[in-house]
């Protein structure tokens, strides 16, 4: 019983460390844009609701993507070019522990929360600078045997934490 408890606690502790320090990603568009029931999704995140003339444009876009995908088997950008309501093609996406940022929008649990504030943008920029510095430090480190169980060895480098807006709402 004592061994089981110790192993369970050790497993919980190491998974907590790995989860809190290493789960983030950054990518640049274009991202997949889909339309369902007048709702636009970009990168599977709710982006906007269509209104007015955009409703017809959305239906035509969905039909064109369906045709390009299932009939023509042509996924080239010329065939599947999204309308402007899908957002800019060079948007950035950040997936942090606790939230995602796509373009100027904050999502938690894949639900839109709010647009980013100027302070949020500054935090993202600071995070990007810290990540660049962390990666440069990592490159300059001598080869090692890795990080057992996702834990940073004593005195090892740690990546920066995610922006505070991912944890404070």
UniProtKB/Swiss-Prot annotation:
GO terms for cellular component: extracellular region. Residues 135-169 are annotated as: Disordered. Body wall. SUPFAM superfamilies: Pepsin inhibitor-3. Disulfide bonds join 33-79, 68-86, 99-166. Residues 158-169 have a biased composition (Pro residues). GO terms for molecular function: aspartic-type endopeptidase inhibitor activity. CDD domains: API3. Residues 1-20 form the signal peptide. Its main location: secreted. Gene3D superfamilies: Pepsin inhibitor-3. The keyword Disulfide bond applies. It is found in: Secreted. Keywords: Aspartic protease inhibitor, Disulfide bond, Protease inhibitor, Pyrrolidone carboxylic acid, Secreted, Signal. Transmembrane segments: none annotated. It comes from the Eukaryota. The modification Pyrrolidone carboxylic acid is found at residue 21. The keyword Cell cycle does not apply. Belongs to the protease inhibitor I33 family. This is an inhibitor of the aspartic protease pepsin. This is Major pepsin inhibitor 3.
């Amino acid at each position: 019983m004592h061994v089981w408890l110790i192993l369970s606690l050790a497993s919980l502790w190491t998974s907590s460390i790995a989860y809190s320090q290493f789960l983030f990603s950054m990518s640049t568009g274009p991202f997949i844009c889909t339309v369902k029931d007048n709702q636009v999704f970009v990168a599977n995140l709710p982006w906007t609701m269509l209104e007015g003339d955009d409703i017809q444009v959305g239906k035509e876009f969905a039909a064109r993507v369906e045709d390009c995908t299932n009939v023509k088997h042509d996924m080239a950008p010329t065939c599947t070019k999204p309308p402007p309501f899908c957002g800019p093609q060079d948007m950035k996406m950040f997936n942090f522990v606790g939230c995602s940022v796509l373009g100027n929008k904050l999502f938690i649990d894949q639900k839109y929360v709010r647009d980013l504030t100027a302070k949020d943008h500054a935090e993202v920029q600071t995070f990007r600078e810290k990540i660049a510095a962390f990666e440069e430090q990592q490159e300059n480190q001598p080869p090692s045997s890795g990080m057992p169980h996702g834990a940073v060895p004593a005195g090892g480098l740690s990546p920066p934490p995610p922006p505070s807006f991912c944890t404070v709402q």
